[in-house]
Structure formats: structure tokens, C-alpha cells
Amino acid sequence: MSYQLSERWTFDMFYSNRNMSGNVDNRFITSLKKDGYYRTSNDFNKRNTFNNQLIGSNLSYNGKYIECGLTGVYNVFNKMLNPSIRYYNTYYARGRDFLNIGINYKLFWKDFIFSGETAVDKRGKIATFNKLSYSPDSDKKFVVMNRFYDVAYQSLYARSVSEGNSVQNESGIYIGMETNLLGN
């Protein structure tokens, strides 16, 4: 549901209640099935074994030189998410409920654009991604991107630039240039 509060302000709300698939051992969810394939009887035994409710909202401002927003998302399962502890999954999400609050921003100044997003989970762990781009003309663009995702940051649905498959335990800088060598 979306509300246009004024010419520049928008408020969005969303809610989801769905059954999900994964391994369930008594009252614990031991793994989430994310591939969507149900080819074997073992796959079918994992289908719709627990419930997830998600509620959230976003307040955003869209101005001439600045765009920004504040987002909050709350997830709750009907069972405890508790994967078996292994060396490789020490910091995987664990618990019954998850809260994430984030801000996004984009500033325009002459040929520069600074943008990014910073989020915090319910335990105070941070994930942030920031980008500065400079376009001196229509054929060239210089970009610097920085990311820092705390080793223990937990968000079930976060997606961002990363070398791994989760927004967790990474930091890095990317420097690049985009150009049109052949012209228009």
C-alpha cells in the first residue's frame, strides 16, 4: 500500500504471510530451502513446513538535489530458525524474529552523485554500501564504491553488491571507469 503524502514525500507499507520450505526438526527450522526445486520425495518433505510473516514500511523523500528514505522490516517465524552449528555457518541467522532498519540516500551536486544505504539489525550489527560517481561528460563515468557488512549482520532478504551470496562478513572498495570508446 502506498500513500503520496505530498509532492515529495511517499509512505509505503507491506505485509506478507506465507508458508516456506526447509528442514524442520521438531520445533526448530534447521535450514531454508531457497532453490525452489521439488524433484524428489525428500524435496517434497521440506515443502511448506513453516510459516513466515513479514511487515514493513518505507518513508521516502524525493527532492531536486537529495533523495532519502527510512525503511523498517520485521520478520517472524512460527518456529525457531536454528541451523546446526558448523564452522562455515557460525554467523548464520538464528532466532524466531528479525528486525532491520535502514536509511538510503542519494545526493546530486554538479557532475557528482553520492548514494548508498546503511542498515542495522536488532543486535546493532551494521551493513553499509556507499557509491560516489563522477560524470564529466556523457561519454565518461568514474565510480568509487565502498562496502562494509559486519560478520554478524543478519537480514534474511538483504541483497547488495558482494562477492559471496549474503550481505555479511565483507568489506571492500571498487574503483572503476565507464567510457564509450566508439562514440554515440
Question: Where are these predicted regions, by residue range?
Answer:
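Exposed, low-structure sequence patches enriched in small/polar residues
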Residues: N48-I85, T90-N184
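Surface-exposed coil loops of outer-membrane beta-barrel proteins
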Residues: M1-N58, D150-I175
